[in-house]
Amino acid sequence: MTKQRVCPVCGSTEFIYDPERGEIVCARCGYVIEENIVDMGPEWRAFDASQREKRSRTGAPESILLHDKGLSTDIGIDRSLTGLMREKMYRLRKWQSRLRVSDAAERNLAFALSELDRITAQLKLPKHVEEEAARLYREAVRKGLIRGRSIESVIAACVYAACRLLKVPRTLDEISDIARVEKKEIGRSYRFIARNLNLTPKKLFVKPTDYVNKFADELGLSEKVRRRAIEILEEAYKRGLTSGKSPAGLVAAALYIASLLEGEKRTQREVAEVARVTEVTVRNRYKELVEKLGIKVPVT
């Protein structure tokens, strides 16, 4: 528990900080509580964000999402320059951008990270997922795992792995829709990277329940149906019925059953389309869950 500062003269707890003198004084009696305080902030003043940006002499923090981690210098743009000077600055910026990616490895990394930015933006993935995917990709490059594989398939595989590691529900189908490579190729790269980066099944395990809200939102199902679907999935997990099964297929079947039980029926086709699985998969998982868990589904 922190002690509250009290003026030793009058007992007041109200103080004024004087940045010019570097002092803290009592607001009631004027007693100097502390002096010679070092101001760790900048020596300049700014009244808005643009002034702050112009006057700041330090760059942005390091970022794993930039190929050079943001440590290179950028030449800015000044629209008030005359024609000749503007032309000169344009040429300098052009050369500077070329120097930033001086060799093939740098160019490949820059391309991979721009592709990562595109995929994560379209999937509306949070920043920490993008950063984890970038970390995995850099590690794969360091270990020489990219050779013989397309950059697009490896970066898509890293996005999928990052989603699974951080328990963000995204299916391989969703990622392959955005990526410029086929699902099979992404799957191969994903398995190869997972094996060589020691991403064990335990680390990559995603509970089917993590997908419930995502699919239920798209189907417009109530909280009551979601809770029932989660109960079904948890019971299935306890009985070992989820092992080796696609989470999307299991969730689709559980939501289908729950929608029937709670009187909010959705067709197998509707559920299959949302989960990006076939109707046959939904039907097979449905039969298995109903039989093994002894669920009595109302006849419709």
Swiss-Prot record:
Keywords: Metal-binding, Repeat, Transcription, Transcription regulation, Zinc, Zinc-finger. GO terms for biological process: transcription preinitiation complex assembly. The keyword Cell membrane does not apply. Sequence repeats lie at residues 114-197, 210-291. Gene3D superfamilies: 1.10.472.170, Cyclin-like. Belongs to the TFIIB family. This is Transcription initiation factor IIB.
